[in-house]
C-alpha cells in the first residue's frame, strides 16, 4: 500500500498546456524464455533544437556557471520528451543513468531535478527525511486529492497521523483480513473468470486485478463492498478515473468530490454505530468482529481527530492501496506467463502447501517461491518507479555531491533495480536470486538495493498488507487456473501512479483441477 506520487503528475507541473502524443513502448526486460523483446519505437526527428532541454537545465540550475555540485548535466534529446512528460518517464531516466552515471541533473519544464540511481545516495536521502529532506513536490501535486492525509503530510501532522494509523495494521487484523477479505475476493475473481477459462476467451487481467484490489481495499478500509468485479457505479468510475488522470485536475474535480462525499458518508455511519455501542479499544490488537475495518479501529480508538482529517487519511490509503497492488499482480502474472518453468514451480508450491485449502495468514510464510516471484516482479516493475524528495537544507550526498536547500531529488527506484552495477542479470526475471530460506528482501537487508516500499521514516505503512494481499490473491488464482499471454500483444509501459500497460494485459486462461489433500497425497504416492 505504497503512497505513490503520480509520475504523470510531473507533466501537469511542468507542461500544463502542451500535449505530446503517447507512443507505445515495448518492455526493455530480457525475460527468461522470451523472444518478444523489441526496442522502443524510434520517433521522427523534429525542427526543434535537440539540445533545448539541456540548455534549459543549465539556465535553471542554481549553481550557475561555477557549478561546484560535481553533478553532471544530462543532455536530453527531443526523442525523450514524450516519455518524460506523457509516457514511461523512467525509461529515459534509465538511458541517462547509463550515459552519465548514478547521479545527474535534469530539467523537466521549469523544475530542476537531481536524479539519483545509487543505493547509497538513496539511503542517505530517504533516511534523513524530516531533518534534511521533505516530500516537497509530492505534497504539492497530490494535495487536491489527499488534502492533509498522512501519505503527503509533513512535520508534526505526519508524525501524529502515522502514529494513529499504524496500530490499526496489527497482526490480528491482518490475519482476519486474509481470511475474510483477501481469500473471499480472490474466490470471487476466480468465479468471474471461470466462463472465460472454459471457452478460451481473452481476458484483460490488468482490468480484473484492478477490480479485485478495489474490492479488497474497500472492505479492509471501510467494510464497504465496491463489488467492482460484478457491478459498476459512479464511485468506481471516479476512483478509476483518478488513478488515470490524477494530474489533470480539472477533469478529476468531479471524481474527487464524489469520492470524498462517499468516504464522509461512511465515516458518519460508522461513527454512529461506534457511539451507539459505546465501543472503545480495550486491547492492543483490537478488532471488531462484525466490522474489522481500519475505519472502525480508528473511530473506536476515540482519538480526537476531525472527520476531514480522517477522510484524507483514508483516501490516501484507498488510492495507494488499490493502485499499487493491482500493478504488482499485473506484472507478476505477466512475468510468470513469460516463464513457464517458474509458473509451474509456483503452482506446485501452492498445491503442496495448501492442499486445496484457502490460504491462511500462517500459510503465507511457507509460500516462499511465490513470494520471491512477487518480490522479483517488484524489482523489475517497482511501484512507484520514482520517489521524490526536496532538500530542506544544504547537504553533501555520498560521493561528495552537493545540493542546495530547495533542490528537488528524484530517486529512480527503477534505475536502482535495473542497474548492472547493483544486480547480476539485472534485466532478467530470476526469482531464485532471493534465497528462499533467507529473510524476505527489503530495503534494510539489501542495503537499499531493493526499495519497492521506499525506506526510512516515510516507508510505506501498508507494506505487509500489500504483500499479503498479492501473495494470497495469486495463490488462490494459481490453485484454479493457468494463464498464457495472448500472442502478438504490444505490452508497452506507461506511468500513472504506478507502471501500467499501454493497452491492457490479455491472457487466455485454462482451468486447473484444484488439489485437495487426498488428490495431492495420491499424486505423491504414484510419483
Sequence positions of predicted segments:
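N-terminal membrane-proximal hinge/A-helix region immediately C-terminal to the signal-anchor transmembrane segment
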Residues: 2-15, 19-148, 154-156, 160, ...
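Cytochrome P450
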Residues: 2-12, 51, 107-114, 171-184, ...
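Conserved cytochrome P450 K-helix E-x-x-R motif and the immediately C-terminal K′/meander segment
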Residues: 80-101, 258-261, 265, 357-399, ...
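Conserved cytochrome P450 catalytic core segment spanning the I/J/K helices
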Residues: 170-171, 252-329, 362-363, 367, ...
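Central I-helix of cytochrome P450 enzymes
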Residues: 213, 217, 221-222, 259-264, ...
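Cytochrome P450 heme-thiolate "Cys pocket" and heme-binding signature region
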Residues: 320, 437-470, 494-496, 501
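Cytochrome P450 heme-binding "Cys pocket" and the immediately downstream C-terminal segment
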Residues: 340-342, 409, 464-500, 504, ...
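Conserved cytochrome P450 K-helix/beta-meander segment immediately N-terminal to the heme-binding cysteine loop
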Residues: 411-441, 524
Amino acid at each position: 500500500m505504497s503512497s505513490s506520487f503520480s509520475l504523470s503528475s510531473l507533466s501537469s507541473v511542468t507542461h500544463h498546456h502542451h500535449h505530446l502524443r503517447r507512443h507505445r513502448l515495448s518492455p526493455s526486460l530480457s525475460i527468461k524464455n522470451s523472444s518478444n523483446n523489441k526496442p522502443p519505437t524510434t520517433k521522427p526527428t523534429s525542427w526543434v533544437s535537440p539540445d533545448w532541454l539541456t540548455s534549459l537545465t543549465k539556465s535553471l540550475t542554481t549553481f550557475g556557471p561555477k557549478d561546484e555540485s560535481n553533478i553532471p548535466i544530462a543532455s536530453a534529446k527531443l526523442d525523450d520528451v514524450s516519455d518524460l512528460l506523457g509516457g514511461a518517464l523512467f525509461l529515459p531516466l534509465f538511458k541517462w543513468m547509463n550515459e552519465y552515471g548514478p547521479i545527474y541533473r535534469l530539467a523537466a519544464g521549469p523544475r530542476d531535478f537531481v536524479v539519483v540511481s545509487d543505493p547509497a545516495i538513496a539511503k542517505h536521502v530517504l533516511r534523513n527525511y524530516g531533518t534534511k529532506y521533505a516530500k516537497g513536490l509530492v505534497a504539492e501535486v497530490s494535495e487536491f486529492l489527499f488534502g492533509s492525509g498522512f501519505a503527503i503530510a509533513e512535520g508534526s501532522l505526519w508524525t501524529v497521523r502515522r502514529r494513529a494509523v499504524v496500530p490499526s495494521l496489527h497482526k490480528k487484523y491482518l490475519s482476519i483480513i486474509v481470511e475474510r477479505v483477501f481469500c473471499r475476493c480472490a474466490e470471487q475473481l476466480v468465479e468471474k473468470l471461470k466462463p472465460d477459462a472454459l471457452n478460451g476467451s481473452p481476458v484483460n487481467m490488468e482490468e480484473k486485478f484492478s477490480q479485485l484490489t478495489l474490492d479488497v481495499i474497500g472492505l479492509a478500509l471501510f467494510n464497504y463492498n465496491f463489488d467492482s468485479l460484478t457491478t459498476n457505479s459512479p464511485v468506481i468510475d471516479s476512483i478509476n478515473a483518478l488513478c488515470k488522470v490524477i494530474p489533470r485536475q480539472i477533469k478529476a474535480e468531479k471524481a474527487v468530490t464524489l469520492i470524498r462525499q462517499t468516504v464522509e458518508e461512511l465515516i458518519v455511519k460508522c461513527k454512529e454505530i461506534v457511539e451507539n455501542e459505546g465501543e472503545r479499544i480495550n486491547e492492543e490488537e483490537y478488532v471488531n468482529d462484525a466490522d474489522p475495518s481500519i475505519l472502525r479501529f480508528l473511530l473506536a480508538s476515540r482519538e480526537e481527530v476531525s472527520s476531514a482529517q480522517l477522510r484524507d487519511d483514508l483516501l490516501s490509503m484507498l488510492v495507494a492501496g488499490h493502485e499499487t497492488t493491482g500493478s504488482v499482480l499485473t506484472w507478476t502474472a505477466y512475468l510468470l506467463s513469460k516463464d513457464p518453468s517458474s509458473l509451474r514451480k509456483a503452482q506446485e508450491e501452492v498445491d503442496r502447501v495448501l492442499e486445496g485449502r484457502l490460504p491462511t495468514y500462517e500459510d503465507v510464510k511457507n509460500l516462499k517461491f511465490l513470494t520471491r516471484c512477487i518480490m522479483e516482479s517488484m524489482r523489475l516493475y517497482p511501484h512507484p518507479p520514482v520517489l521524490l524528495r526536496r532538500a530542506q537544507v544544504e547537504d553533501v550526498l555520498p560521493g561528495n555531491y552537493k545540493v542546495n536547500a530547495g533542490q528537488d531529488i528524484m530517486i529512480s527506484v527503477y534505475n536502482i533495480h535495473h542497474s548492472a552495477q547493483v544486480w547480476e542479470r539485472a534485466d532478467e526475471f530470476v526469482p531464485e536470486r532471493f534465497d528462499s530460506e533467507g529473510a524476505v528482501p527489503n530495503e534494510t537487508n539489501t542495503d537499499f538495493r531493493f526499495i519497492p516500499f521506499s525506506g526510512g521514516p516515510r516507508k510505506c505503512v501498508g507494506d505487509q498488507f500489500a504483500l499479503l494481499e498479492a501473495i494470497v490473491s495469486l495463490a488462490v488464482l494459481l490453485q484454479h487456473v493457468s494463464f498464457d499471454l495472448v500472442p502478438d500483444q504490444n505490452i508497452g509501459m506507461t506511468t500513472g501512479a504506478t507502471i501500467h500497460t499501454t493497452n491492457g494485459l490479455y491472457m487466455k486462461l485454462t482451468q486447473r483441477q484444484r488439489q485437495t489433500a487426498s488428490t495431492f497425497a495420491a499424486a505423491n504416492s504414484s510419483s
